[in-house]
Amino acid sequence: MTRILILGGTGEARALAAALADVPGVEAVSSLAGRVRDPRLPVGDVRIGGFGGADGLAECVRAHPVDAIVDATHPFAAQITRNAADAAHRRGIPLVVLRRPEWSPRPGEHWHGAADLADAAELLPDLGTRIFLTIGRQGVDAFADLQALWFLIRAIDPPDVAMPPHSTLLLARGPFAVADETALMREHRIDVLVTKNSGGGQTDAKLDAARALGIPVLMIRRPPLPPATETVDDVAGAIAWVGTLTRR
């Protein structure tokens, strides 16, 4: 039996868990960080909660042995990816990172790149005054000192950090339709969209809406992966990678 630890919390992680449940000789357990109050649970065994850093993750895979780790977390979950690489190296087990392809600007789109949240906050005052902030609830405090701007902040759960003084919080979970995103931006007179380059096989609805309305996008670039990290682009690639383990 090949035992796989899936570091999850994304749609790809749920799809991978469901697919591996039907593969003979493979047993997968999914781990969720527990940062969302009502997470969408994957098929199969699930653990919820952090590991306590790389040391805790290494101890977890020692106490509950696995043959490999698939990191299918969000592309911006940089710390857990570093921890996974560290723990896998210590335990001498293979790791693959499932990273969906990045988005790229299309004709008619107006993108401005930011290295991280702090860089985005510094660039934002020169781009507009009514901001649609779609980075999730973590990191909202990077914009808390921008008192001259107004923000529409969308997140699944309320932020537990400082928020910009002039802001409206919209609690909602996607996916969203292009027509709804367009109407939302028009209603709130949005003139800049701030988002992360989460990527995926299809363009996000908010990017399509911003393009249609001629609204510039401040796109936060992904953090780099640990050196020499093996990656796959999609669930099919992750399944094929697991298949190489079962044939060893």
UniProtKB/Swiss-Prot annotation:
Top EC class, one word: oxidoreductase
Give, as in the UniProt entry, the pathway in which the protein acts.
Cofactor biosynthesis; adenosylcobalamin biosynthesis; cob(II)yrinate a,c-diamide from precorrin-2 (aerobic route): step 6/10
Keywords, sorted A to Z: Cobalamin biosynthesis, NADP, Oxidoreductase
InterPro entries per the UniProt record, alphabetical: Precorrin-6x_reduct (IPR003723)
* Lipid biosynthesis recorded as keyword: no
PROSITE patterns linked: COBK_CBIJ
- Per the UniProt record, one Pfam family is CbiJ
Q: Does the keyword NADP apply?
A: yes
- The EC number of this protein is 1.3.1.54
The UniProt family comment states: Belongs to the precorrin-6x reductase family.
Functionally, this protein is described as follows: Catalyzes the reduction of the macrocycle of precorrin-6X into precorrin-6Y.
Q: What protein is this chain from? A: Precorrin-6A reductase
Q: Which organism is it from?
A: Rhodococcus erythropolis
